[in-house]
Design a protein with these regions (language model features):
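N-terminal core-binding DNA-recognition domain of tyrosine recombinases/integrases
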Residues: 13-28, 34, 38-122
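Gly/serine-rich nucleotide phosphate-binding loop at the start of the catalytic core
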Residues: 7-10, 32
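Blade/loop signatures of beta-propeller domains
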Residues: 1-5
Length: 124
């Protein structure tokens, strides 16, 4: 049976089956990841001109991810550490999705290639 490409279905499997059952991550990790997607999904829906329920995995591409990270820093005034934590949550999902929907590996790989941001060195 082929796993659906819709983002909401994959996220549901990611949170319920993968994070909780298979990985057995802490409830704090689940909450942090959940909070990331509560911010990211409305942003992605607006950017894609779609409703959240109609988003596809392919909508989560590198260009949209870069715009989201910029939004976190510039409009939400998040620190680099927070930006990187949000990116880590999205990467965890993308790694899961790459196994569940290998047909979308080219899009997923490009999104996974978005780097973390390094903190600026403070000069005395």
């Amino acid at each position: 049976m082929k796993v659906q490409n819709d983002l909401s279905h994959l996220l549901q499997l990611f949170f319920k089956s993968y994070l909780v059952s298979q990985r057995q991550v802490s409830q704090h990790t689940v909450a942090a990841y959940r909070d990331t997607f509560r911010i990211f999904l409305p942003f992605l829906a607006k950017l894609s001109n779609k409703k959240i329920g109609t988003l596809l995995l392919t909508d989560l591409n590198a260009a949209h991810l870069i715009k989201f990270l910029s939004y976190l820093e510039n409009e939400r005034a998040n620190s680099i550490a927070t930006r990187n934590a949000r990116l880590a949550a999205i990467r965890a999902f993308l790694n899961y999705a790459s196994i569940e929907v290998p047909d979308e590996l080219p899009v997923i790989s490009r999104a996974l290639a978005v780097p973390q941001k390094k903190k600026a060195l403070q000069r005395n």
